[in-house]
Design a protein with these regions (language model features):
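Alpha-helical transmembrane segments of integral membrane proteins
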Residues: 2-23, 365-677
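Hydrophobic secretory-pathway targeting helix
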Residues: 2-53
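Soluble extramembrane regions of membrane proteins in the secretory/endomembrane system
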Residues: 34-357
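Hydrophobic transmembrane alpha-helical segments in integral membrane proteins
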Residues: 359-363
Length: 677
């Protein structure tokens, strides 16, 4: 217990922790300002999708551009052209040689060749001329010829017909100019060229320079354009034009989809990067428009996403056209983001933030002291060695920090704070329970119990949030904001506090008639615990704990157990009424357990029940702290999420209070009836 510390060492540890919190808090304030200045979200839709929809929806492309603008779309994604795309849009005509021979007899036509002609419209002529230049660059001289037939220019290609139709031709300037006329921004999606040369990169930048509306580069496929040989050359052009590279969030929300070269470009370009959320069409069709909108909304506010790439549904709904169905769910996302305080426009690029090394060092010193306090609470006999332990830990961590081992040190201390904070908070709570253990419920009453529980909840919650600031202060930099680096040990932050609090609990409260003070006591406790008779009720309780454990641990992370539909509905409701949706294990489970644990204490219910309730509280406090380990989530959102959880937990306490009153009256009724008999 803290009260058993030598007075001087406790004062010194408390002072170091306080100074560290101030430094970590200042770093977190700087982080908040960086995040607060990057609140513009770019909403992107596929340009070709609009053209294809216009051709089958009895409307014009201009009308659909207007529809999507009103829904919130700010930008159109432009991809590499292919011969098939150009032919489908009516810009060129593609013939197999054998097909052309059947219509005309000319010795110049060969049956094993492909022939391309312009459609003789103004757009067709432009596309044909640009296609001619692209094919000349991409094909061997022997495989590409220009011939004239009946005063008409034809392109003769020696290639497999089917494969040629889908051959990437690069992004066309003509397409970029057409998109520019819509007034929307343009997101270019180039594919890599096999054995790319500087000429290929120059060709791409000539397309970029043809418009002033290019907002970002979002590579298509598994490699960045120019990877690997021309990546440095591409980087120079991107820097010169101040164009951000877009990184696509991975489907499991950890890191990014593999695109070789993109992280290198981002690192070397000073993190001039935008984080993008994209949902596959296969995933979209499983969701109704409201749920799809919620996915995009949540990804933006919770994961520093500043660009959304919207897919199209396969089928229309509610008697609308497909475009209207798509525009409706996009409009829903736009409305919710604007209500949350975001702007819609060209994507914000976060400042490449790295805090002062002096501030970071102070945060590390405080975090190390916090970990020392947690260790002393778990292993009390080490208290007499507190001075040397603190000095050794301080010197060791500072040496690592200043000698180039910063990365692993920061990860270790962040994990230590995520585990140590709930351990310290729960130790204080258990000390309070020990002091109140002899109080009888008849001297307190339900009203007093509720007020006491609320005050304890908020006291514990505030202490947990203060400890959580250490995680933010230690990890804060642009690499963590963008999730190029991630916090390691999420599962441990759930499990270790439970183990540590259990060890402290048996030193505070008597299991099997006595508290654990010495190592012999602990061995005796383990032996008695292993000799407990397993009854049906105990087996049922263990099974229940197993289910709770599956939910608690299995649902953590990004690939956890499935979430039932009723819980999804609850989540969406909370997202609508709160700035940040709190976690269910906090406000439905951990926070109300404070009230139940006090009731168990004052009513002198079985010790095992009080223990499980303390474990439940630990889960709630640990969850509050662990929230801050998700560094891609804005600092203010994590902070308000914790506060919202305390508010919701207080409300749920009222329901728990009513349930406890009813349960107590029922048990008293049957007890009195049994005694009379």
């Amino acid at each position: 217990m803290i009260k058993t510390y030598p007075h001087n060492i406790f004062k010194i540890l408390a002072a170091i922790i306080l100074l560290g919190v101030i430094a970590a808090g200042y770093i977190s304030w700087q982080r908040y300002n960086v995040e607060a200045h990057a609140t513009t979200v770019e909403m992107v839709y596929d340009y070709n999708n609009i053209l294809e929809s216009a051709s089958v929806e009895s409307t014009s492309a201009d009308e659909l551009f207007s529809l999507y603008k009103r829904s919130g779309i700010t930008s159109l994604a432009v991809y590499d052209e292919t011969p098939k795309k150009l032919a489908d849009h009516g810009y060129i005509a593609v013939y197999h040689g054998s097909e052309l021979i059947s219509h005309m007899s000319n010795p110049l036509i060969r049956g094993n060749r492909i022939y391309i002609a312009s459609t003789n419209t103004s757009e067709g002529i432009e596309y044909f001329d640009e296609l001619k230049g692209q094919l000349k660059r991409l094909l061997r001289k022997d495989d590409f010829h220009i011939i004239h037939l009946n005063n008409e220019e034809l392109l003769e290609i020696n290639a497999n017909y089917e494969r040629f139709l889908n051959m990437p031709l690069g992004i066309f300037k003509t397409t970029v100019k057409k998109v520019e006329q819509t007034g929307l921004y343009i997101v270019l999606r180039p594919m890599n060229v096999p054995h790319a040369t500087r000429e290929d990169i120059d060709q791409f930048f000539s397309v970029v320079d043809s418009s002033g509306k290019i907002s970002a580069i979002l590579f298509q496929g598994k490699e960045a354009l120019g990877y690997p040989a021309q990546l440095e050359y591409l980087l120079g052009g991107l820097k010169e034009r101040h164009l951000p590279v877009v990184l696509i969030e991975a489907q499991n929300q950890l890191g990014f989809e593999r695109q070789d070269g993109t992280l290198t470009l981002s690192n070397k370009d000073g993190y001039n990067t935008v984080r993008l959320y994209a949902m596959s069409k296969d995933e979209l069709i499983k969701l109704d428009p409201k749920e799809a909108a919620s996915r995009f909304y949540v990804s933006t506010i919770e994961r520093n996403v500043r660009m959304n790439l919207f897919p199209s549904y396969k089928f229309a709904a509610n008697g609308e056209t497909l475009s209207e169905t798509n525009a409706r769910y996009i409009h829903d996302v736009t409305n919710r983001l604007e209500k949350h305080g975001f702007n819609i426009g060209k994507a914000s690029v976060m400042e490449p933030y790295f805090p002062s090394r002096i501030l970071r060092a102070a945060s590390i010193a405080g975090a190390a002291s916090l970990c020392v306090v947690a260790i002393l609470l778990i292993v009390p006999f080490l208290v007499k060695y507190a001075w040397p332990i603190e000095v050794i830990v301080f010197l060791f961590t500072q040496t690592l920090y200043w000698t180039g081992y910063e990365a692993i040190l920061r990860q270790a201390l962040a994990l230590g704070c995520a585990v140590g904070t709930p351990v310290i908070v729960m130790s204080l709570f258990m000390d309070y329970c020990v002091q109140k253990k002899q109080s009888a419920f008849k001297n307190i009453g339900w009203g007093h119990l509720f007020i006491e529980a609320v005050l304890l909840l908020w006291g514990c919650g505030i202490l947990s949030l203060i400890g959580a600031i250490y995680i933010s202060g230690i990890l804060s930099d642009i690499r963590f904001f963008l999730e190029m680096n991630i916090f390691r040990g999420v599962k441990l932050t759930f499990i270790l506090p439970l183990i540590c609090v259990s060890l402290i609990y048996i030193q505070r409260f008597p299991f099997f008639g006595k508290v654990v003070v010495t190592d012999k006591d602990f061995i005796g406790f383990v032996k008695k615990f292993c000799q407990i008779d397993i009854k049906l009720g105990v087996l049922a309780l263990i099974s229940l704990l197993g289910i709770i454990g599956f939910i608690f641990i299995g649902r953590s992370g990004n690939n956890g157990a499935p979430v039932p539909s009723f819980e999804i509905s609850l989540r969406r409701f909370l997202e609508d009424i709160m700035y940040a949706r709190p976690r269910e294990k906090e406000f439905l489970f951990g926070h109300p357990a404070i009230l139940a644990s006090l009731a168990a204490l004052y009513h002198r219910w079985p010790q095992i029940l009080h223990y499980f309730l303390v474990i439940a509280i630990t889960i709630g406090q640990g969850s509050m702290v662990e929230t801050f380990a998700h560094m891609r989530s804005p600092f203010i959102l994590s902070l308000i999420r914790g506060i919202d959880g305390l508010v919701a937990g207080t409300a749920v306490m009222i329901i728990v209070l009513a349930g406890l009153i009813i349960l107590t009256h029922i048990t008293e009724f049957f007890r009195e009836r049994y005694e009379k008999e």
